[in-house]
Regions:
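Short, mixed-charge low-complexity intrinsically disordered segments
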Residues: 28-36, 40
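Conserved short hydrophobic interaction patches
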Residues: 22-25
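Short proline/glycine-enriched turn/loop segments at secondary-structure junctions
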Residues: 42-47
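Surface-exposed ligand/attachment interfaces on beta-rich extracellular proteins
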Residues: 15
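Short amphipathic
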Residues: 1-10
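C-terminal edge-of-domain segments
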Residues: 48-62
Length: 62
């Protein structure tokens, strides 16, 4: 069965830590793909906000 896990953080280091923690629980042969995205925008108060996201596609066996 294919599954996905989605991560979304404001800091890239937090994203890295969370992804590495998740991947440490998987067999590396079960990871199909990792999609990565960065978005930046300005809030109504003028603050620059970054969004670092990743989606891991992986296989589990039942």
């Amino acid at each position: 069965m294919l599954c996905v896990e989605i991560f979304d953080e404001e800091h890239e280091k937090d994203l890295q830590v969370n992804i590495n923690n998740f991947l440490s629980e998987l067999n590396e042969n079960d990871v199909i793909d990792i999609k990565y995205s960065i978005n930046a925008f300005t809030s109504s108060s003028g603050e620059q906000i970054y969004c670092y996201s990743a989606m891991i596609i992986y296989r589990i066996y039942k």
